Amino acid sequence: MLEKYKTVYEGGEGEIVEKKSRFIATVRPVQTEEEALAFIEEMKKKYWDARHNCYVYSVGKNREYTRCSDDGEPSGTAGRPMLDVILGEDIYNVAAVVTRYFGGILLGTGGLVRAYSRSLQEGLAASTVIEKTYGISMEVVTDYTGIGKIQSVFCKISPASQYFRSMFCIFSGSESPAASS
């Protein structure tokens, strides 16, 4: 059976206000750690005037690249709770930045954990989350007489055959050297 996983197809943005502090969660699908880091830098530039730009990302089939940052918030109050949301939702290949504009009222550690978690949940709710299936891409080249054999092999793989997409290009005619003038 082919493995399925959840990922973000289209990113989104969610926002909450907690005791006058504004939390903006921006979520984006990523395929590599480099894409995740570029997205984080993009958000830091966009929200350069914010007090904090905390982030989380999880990339890879086995979450090979998973990181989070509190960006100056008390240790464990922003990045880790955001990571817990991603892990709890079982979403792969995703990056998120939660930007905080401080409203003048301290939230305490529990308040920060709840605010960062809730804002990321809002960001995910505004995103399009889909289920994908791990698979392979392959190209098979054959002459016309081999097409039936290839189709037969794919049908024997059932029920996985529903995951195969085929494309056939049939050319007719013959090749001949170009006439020289």
Language model regions located:
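Terminal, non-globular segments
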Residues: 173-180
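Positively charged, aromatic-enriched nucleic acid-contacting surfaces
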Residues: 74-91
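Short amphipathic alpha-helix segments
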Residues: 141-160, 179
